[in-house]
A protein has these predicted regions:
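Short, surface-exposed beta-strand segments enriched in small/polar/acidic residues
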Residues: 4-20
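Active-site-proximal helix/loop segments of hydrolytic enzymes
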Residues: 4, 27-138
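Glycine- and acidic-residue-enriched helix-capping/strand-helix junction motifs
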Residues: 16-32
Length: 138
């Protein structure tokens, strides 16, 4: 089994860098997703550390706190949960935008395919797969 760090990628809602708002509040919903991802991975027998920042701080402060927590563990992968606000589907089209995993290093592709498989086996959310972005700023 593998060992992972997982975190919701923003500060709590209304406290500093709390992510996208509009149809939903990213910092609220990404914590729900993060908790479910952790539950699913643990159910598969993996060791998972929750490295979420729950403090009121800036974007850089949040990132620094997350990195410090993640660096406390020797893991096979670090996962940051974010929600893409690009659809702007205020009226609804009865379709989910889906979930994708963006990687910047091919070495993690096999592990992340397994991660996505576990997530989607237990979900109705569309699987948008693993995508490569060497300039990933996530």
């Amino acid at each position: 089994m593998a060992t992972y760090n997982v975190h919701a990628g923003h500060c709590p809602q209304g406290q500093g860098a709390s992510g996208a708002v509009g149809i939903l509040q990213e910092s609220v919903e990404d914590r729900i997703v993060k908790d479910e991802v952790i539950r699913l991975l643990r159910a598969e027998g993996h060791t998972v550390y929750d490295c979420t920042c729950d403090e009121n701080t800036t974007k850089q402060g949040c990132l620094n706190k997350i990195v410090a927590k993640c660096n406390q563990h020797g893991v096979d992968g670090d996962y940051s949960i974010h929600l893409n606000s690009g659809r702007n589907d205020y009226h609804g089209d009865n379709s989910t935008g889906g979930v994708e995993v963006i990687i910047y290093d091919d070495a993690m592709k096999k592990v992340l395919k397994e991660f996505v498989r576990i997530l989607h086996r237990n979900s109705v959310i569309r699987n948008r797969g693993v995508k490569y972005d060497k300039d990933c700023s996530c």
